[in-house]
Curated annotation (Swiss-Prot):
This is Large ribosomal subunit protein uL23. Contacts protein L29, and trigger factor when it is bound to the ribosome. Part of the 50S ribosomal subunit. PANTHER family: 60S RIBOSOMAL PROTEIN L23A. GO terms for biological process: translation.
Length: 99
């Protein structure tokens, strides 16, 4: 049995299911919402261990929080860090199933 470090579950927060990420999945890419301080090597290791796949590359981006009005007052949403993970040929992740 493979040993999974519990910290891997802290790195990967959730899959991102949008129209754009669904189109990227056709090119062997998966998009995840990740912890704000996570580095590319940490993300790569976590995805490889949790999903038992081989990762080719990891690209990250930070989506800045938007200002929204709520009941007459303005607030700011939190920033969200995302990782676009490119998988090696022959490897797939189905984000609709759980771990």
């Amino acid at each position: 049995m493979k040993s999974i470090d519990p910290r891997h579950y802290d790195v990967i927060v959730a899959p991102v299911v949008t129209e754009k990420s669904t189109m990227a999945s056709e090119h062997n890419k998966v998009v995840f919402k990740v912890q704000g301080g996570a580095t590319k090597p940490q993300i790569k290791e976590a995805v490889e261990k949790l999903f038992d796949v081989k990762v080719k590359s990891v690209n990250t981006l930070v989506r800045k929080g938007k200002t929204k009005a709520f009941r007459g007052t303005f607030g700011t949403q939190s920033d969200v860090k995302r990782a676009v993970v490119t998988l090696e040929e022959g490897h797939r992740i189905d984000v609709t199933t759980g771990l």
